Regions:
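Surface-exposed extracellular loop regions of Gram-negative outer-membrane beta-barrel proteins
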Residues: 1-18
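Beta-sheet repeat architectures centered on beta-propellers
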Residues: 20-35, 41-192
Length: 192
């Protein structure tokens, strides 16, 4: 549906845009480049409010929808990774997930129109924003024991850039997870 300002007593008008498409779950849409990326009930598409276009071929589409756990399909969500021009379709897989949390992601790069896949460490949410991880860097000049000529360790520095956003994973148990750029889950690589 589209909402248009019309003024008067009703203020807004709602009109159906597409009669042949819907959304799989509440968090299955994200905006980018004046478009919306949508995981529908049987397709993955983008639209600009006027026209829609599928962005996944039939083979990969079948693999994606057959991989989503049927009991947890409503926990599927899309996470935007704007830094790398990506949209992540995150879901609980039918084979490996027994927690109901997202353990797989199909990743679409909207600049190259290429898809990739990755494993996730059972996350309930991925968010985009500025991540202050400066608390993990506690070395000070006074505490550094290395000699000036041989010491290459950092001290008293900001371990993040407050002007650059990144992805942050969250798990349902409440443990803080590191930035996605670090490929770490509580200090353990999840790529290994």
């Amino acid at each position: 549906y589209i909402m248009s300002h019309i003024g008067g007593a009703f203020i807004f008008d709602f009109s159906q845009i597409f009669s042949d498409a819907g959304i799989l779950a509440q968090r299955c849409v994200q905006a980018f480049d004046d478009k919306h990326f949508v995981v529908g009930t049987d397709d993955v598409y983008i639209h600009n409010g006027q026209t829609k276009q599928s962005v996944i071929d039939n083979v990969l589409k079948d693999e994606l929808f057959n991989s989503i756990h049927s009991s947890y399909y409503d926990r599927t969500f899309v996470a935007p990774n704007y830094k790398d021009n990506e949209m992540w379709v995150c879901f609980a897989s039918g084979v490996e997930s027994n927690t109901g949390q997202a353990d797989k992601a199909f990743v679409w790069n909207y600049r190259t129109n290429k898809w990739s896949k990755r494993d996730l460490p059972d996350v309930s949410h991925i968010s985009w924003g500025i991540v202050d991880d400066s608390g993990t860097y506690t070395s000070s000049y006074d505490a550094d024991s290395g000699s000036w000529d041989s010491d290459s360790t950092p001290w008293d520095f900001r371990g993040y850039n407050p002007t650059q956003s990144a992805l942050l994973l969250a798990e349902p148990t409440g443990n803080k997870l590191h930035k996605i750029d670090s490929y770490q889950n509580n200090g353990t690589s999840y790529l290994a």
